């Protein structure tokens, strides 16, 4: 085997020991597995701390299945393949194997994993006729069965890497030459040497191409420089096996030398994915990132890099196996097993042991023995097996077919992701559907230069032409030159003519002033999307909390927006004329159309297309407008399309992009305004709220300039777009920072300082996609070069919004439907609010006036006074109220009356009565009107009076809780006249002698007693249940002597109230 070391002489003598002398007695039902692996050094993928838990899991499954090795017990014995320094040894491993063979006579050996340890042990086991299983020893030489007759490899092998590279070359059309570079580590198991050996031998065998190879030493910059010169002379397709840091350093030097992805491709042979931090590692995987100040260059260099790793299984059995493996490793082996591609090695040992047990079981069933190593080994070869690592296929040479993955960098995010998978069994390359190989030129570079590495192609060396060819060439060039010069002269003349014509000029007299309110009246009762018809957000300014909107006017019959320019005069220099020409040349549906300009002092102004739906800022801040994500993405796409046109045109950049400069027209199309014409822009005030509020969208590098360019920069526009994107996503205002209430001045100062991390608005991943948040962060990156251009932003938005149609009509109809739905919701909301207010007003009206009277007034009818033949009126007051009021504060008196009348109002709700009024401590109630109830009015009032009296006895005065409130009640029955009096604060009043008499009954009564007139007593006697007591004749003012009664109660009925 190339690169393998010679076995020492004393080990050769051990091979001569007769196998029979090594056999020791044991139990017939015991099957011994001898393990020879590193026992202390856990850095090896096949260390015992990693493989031991897998072996125990495999033996556990054997015990759980009665069909495997019935009647047999599997036991393990251990031997170390390490030397005293903890490194794999070609001496320690064979000695351990001999000791295990002599003492335990094992039926099978498990391991070693290191190549130099496995080589002598593999030769011994072939001599002893004992099978050897390993998921390591991946070198090409271990596959030579003349020496390793009974070795079966259930893990990856490097010759299979050559199969993957062969398929890759065939797919990409590389049929001539490749270069292989590797860092050889002589002190250990030389992993890169054996990786390159397998690739080199298999590719040369299968493709018959030239494969050059070069060894190098890691950490030597001079050596790296010489290595890159070799790359320039011998390769365009380069395979490099080294540590991740060395590969990154090489890529940086390659970038400096001009070896970029247009002409070169570098494959990192990183089979265990160390540069990717493990296949299950953190996302995104960025092997170029180190935070050492070189990341930006490294990311650029890695556009020419791809990474080759083993393919990690993703079947459910493997994922469940990993959980059990980690738990057992931690619990029993005191080892914390991390995620990564190294875990496929213990999984392959697990599957290999199960495959061996299956082969032994079959051998025993056919009359064989566990010591028949050749028969058992042949049963494992050329066989398929379903294990935890998925579909396991051992070929006819005893090597497992290995799957590989190819990783490539996403140019937008810089993260590496799998783009191709190789199936080792079918020898097929399978593309990952959502990812594609990235090539800077759109296609892979050729494996040899166009003219060869040494410019040896004859087609590139024709250094002379015939006379006729020279004349033809000169004549053609002369003609083309003449046509080009003529074309440019014509263009120059047309341009001068257009500049002189001043087609943009507008006379102030041609403008007909018009307020937006008048325009809306002439257009009918149209509603705008923002709900504010007078708003033209593209030209608004803010001063404190007040908004001043641009004026409008009619020009040639069309309504236009008029922006006044705060300048005394505009000098029409050639620069200004070109600015005006460029504005007239703008024709894009996502940019407001430039109508013209007036430069006549003092009426200097700019006329642009008027958009009636308002600005994006107004729409976002109006909480009554519902915007789903389809609508938001549509508005965002409109901004991107407009900015793409600006950046690719003569204007070049906006310089003042913000949500208030994005307006919505009548067709719900968002348009960008206030672009170009930097000579017309108002000089900024030195300080004030307005200045800082305007700068919330400005990029930090422009804020730090003493005199930033009026046109801004393209990277600055991307930053402004990122701020707008956050406004659209959160709808919480411009530069919203959760938990902080900062003024615009404070925000601008923190952004300008350049804090680490940079001070930026908040994001809420619950309200938008994580990818959208990443796009925001890229747009407002501190380094302008890290911000994506609008072309990349457009592609990213397409990924977020795949389900929405790109058809203009479909988008317009969707916006119209969204707008209609929003209007329906708004009308429904306003209707419900109106009905609620109407209900409250009616409830208040019914408390002031009787229900029937209130209904008449609501219908607009005049309430006529009405006479009632018989009603019962109740009067009450508080005895000693005047003295009590004098001894109390006004607030205490108000509280007392409020508590008392609240109690009374709750009681009278249980009776057919109407409360007429309260005056001070006087309380007046009537029954029998406005709805007549026959003779029931006397009974209702009598019962109510008893209930009120009962309530008063338990009533407590807040500021005099020990004092009893003394209520005096008078009741009288008779005719009255009732009606509504007055137009302002109308009141329902009662008139007639009955009212006066009832009042006299109350004033001549006694505290805590109910005083009745004889008329009321006569009506109550009809109900036969009230207890009355004659009081006698009482002298009343204006009435003379009147016979009255006391109401004591009602028989057979508890007092209500």
Curated annotation (Swiss-Prot):
Intervals, Extracellular compartment: 29-469
Cystine connections: 88-114, 192-241, 451-460
Sites bearing Phosphoserine, chain numbering: 515, 525, 530, 534, 538
Cell compartments where the protein resides: Membrane
UniProt modified residues of type Phosphothreonine: 528, 541
Gene3D superfamilies, sorted: 3.40.50.2300, Nucleotide cyclase, Transferase(Phosphotransferase) domain 1
Membrane topology label: Single-pass type I membrane protein
Domain annotation Guanylate cyclase: ranges: 872-1002
Domain Protein kinase: 524-801
Subunit structure as annotated in this protein's UniProt entry: Homodimer.
Identification of the protein by name: Atrial natriuretic peptide receptor 1
UniProt source species: Mus musculus
Gene that this sequence comes from: Npr1
